[in-house]
């Protein structure tokens, strides 16, 4: 696991160099089992979808040393919705429900194997300040696309601050960077921060909106949301 190491220490370490060499030799690394199963069944995989990514230039597949072009950041586990398909690993609000109603949490987990409001075994990884500093120094200057998700990516000041930091950093050319969002699109500003003055500094913005039905179905499934708004 690279969880205790900085991104720049992991990207080109011996383990990842070996993975690239295996892929060049048409060998499946053990950590790629999900993509292997999907592709051998004739389905698209995360790997094949990434290869068709139109927002980044083609990598140099012959080199063992790479520069990251496509970066994914999850800046928060908080969300302003409590969607019924989600759980505490991706939404801290569900974990709070479990703490507030421990009897219900225990009953759901023990009798129904329903752990959506239990403390998650693994939470999504939120980058620390040390990780962000490393990314700005060693990764982001070469990046061509950054995807923000969460939680709800617009529901944290850290996302807006990260965009502003990129704009202010002389080593980062934001006009070469496309922004990608996976969002419920219920907000574009948060606690005095807004994307409106920030987005024009970037090459482009691509937004995927989670909807899941209309009208009353939307309001039921996406608890906390209002379809009319």
Residue spans for each PLM region:
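Accessory C-terminal segments flanking Radical SAM cores
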Residues: 1-53
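Juxtamembrane luminal stem/stalk of type II transmembrane Golgi/ER carbohydrate-processing enzymes
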Residues: 29, 34, 49-66, 105-118
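C-type cytochrome heme c attachment motif
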Residues: 33-34, 81-85
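Detector for the c-type heme attachment site
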Residues: 36-38, 86-92
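Short cysteine/histidine-rich zinc-coordinating motifs and their immediately flanking basic loops
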Residues: 43-58, 91, 95-99
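A Trp-anchored, charged/polar loop motif used as the substrate-binding/catalytic surface
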Residues: 54-62, 125-137
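Core AdoMet radical
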Residues: 68-78, 89-127, 141-157, 169-191, ...
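Short, well-ordered amphipathic alpha-helices
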Residues: 132, 159-168, 192-196
């Amino acid at each position: 696991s690279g969880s205790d190491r900085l991104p720049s220490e992991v990207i080109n370490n011996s383990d990842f160099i070996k993975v690239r060499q295996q892929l060049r030799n048409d060998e499946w690394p053990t950590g790629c089992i999900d993509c292997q199963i999907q592709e051998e069944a004739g389905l698209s995989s995360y790997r094949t979808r990434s290869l068709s990514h139109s927002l980044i230039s083609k990598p140099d597949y012959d080199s063992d040393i790479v520069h990251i072009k496509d970066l994914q950041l999850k800046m928060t586990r908080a969300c302003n919705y409590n969607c019924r398909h989600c759980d505490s690993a991706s939404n801290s609000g569900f974990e709070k429900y479990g703490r507030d109603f421990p009897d219900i949490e225990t009953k759901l987990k023990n009798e129904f194997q329903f752990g959506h409001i239990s403390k998650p075994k693994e939470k999504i990884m939120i980058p620390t300040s040390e990780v962000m500093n490393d990314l700005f120094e060693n990764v982001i200057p070469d990046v061509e696309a950054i995807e923000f998700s969460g939680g709800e990516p617009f529901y944290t000041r850290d996302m807006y601050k990260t965009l502003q930091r990129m704009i202010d950093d002389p080593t980062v050319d934001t006009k070469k960077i496309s922004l990608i969002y996976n969002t419920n699109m219920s907000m574009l500003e948060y606690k005095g921060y807004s994307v409106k003055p920030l987005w024009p500094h970037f090459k482009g913005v691509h937004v995927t909106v989670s909807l899941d039905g209309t009208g009353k179905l939307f309001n039921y499934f996406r608890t906390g949301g209002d379809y009319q708004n």
